[in-house]
C-alpha cells in the first residue's frame, strides 16, 4: 500500500500530501484513522444539537 500512497502523493499539491501523510502506515508520529475523524465530527454535531436544545428550554 505504501507505493500506491507515494504515487498518489506525487500527483498532489504539497499541502494535501502533508495531510495525507497522517494516514500513511510509513509516516512517523501520530496515526489517525480517517474513520475517527468522521466519528469526531459526528460527536461534535450531536453535542451542538443537545446544547441548542438545552438552551431553548
Swiss-Prot record:
Predominant localisation class: membrane
Keywords: Cell membrane, Membrane, Protein transport, Translocation, Transmembrane, Transmembrane helix, Transport
Topological domains, Cytoplasmic: 1-33
GO cellular component annotations of the record: plasma membrane
HAMAP family (alphabetical): SecG
Description of how the protein assembles with itself and partners: Component of the protein translocase complex. Heterotrimer consisting of alpha (SecY), beta (SecG) and gamma (SecE) subunits. Can form oligomers of the heterotrimer.
Function text: Involved in protein export. The function of the beta subunit is unknown, but it may be involved in stabilization of the trimeric complex.
Protein name (record): Preprotein translocase subunit SecG
